[in-house]
């Protein structure tokens, strides 16, 4: 199942890159997201997910609604610690959803979730979130696959403006 996070103002990526503040500000936009309640699979590398088109987006349709199924943006680095920890840039989708409602991202305990972002200090690393708290940011290499690192997709609603008031 997925939780509807509503409309958020955040950036997403379309290819592997380090996300700069400038890029995030120029590319953030309002979009409606659902976020998976769990990691739908684990023990799969970022590279393996990317090979299947699942990091930056795959078209998906259900109930007459068109979506892009993909990983969320999570930040290329982090700032703060504990409950004040955030991915940087802070206009990433993961933190933007949590800023709206801390309950939107569930079942993070002892499970990391892959994000889209390349880590700013090492291009071989990819950002992951979760495990010790919903806000926790960490990283691992794009080729690693571990049982505690999973794929928690988001569904981006593509035609929300044509759905009408009862569409979602």
Sequence positions of predicted segments:
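Surface-exposed charge patches in extracellular/virion surface proteins
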Residues: 8-12, 28, 58, 100, ...
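Short N-terminal edge-element motif at the start of the domain
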Residues: 1-30
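C-terminal, surface-exposed recognition/capping segments
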Residues: 2, 20-23, 38-42, 54, ...
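Short, surface-exposed beta-edge/turn micro-motifs
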Residues: 30-32, 149
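"Short basic amphipathic alpha-helical interaction patches in structured regions
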Residues: 47-54
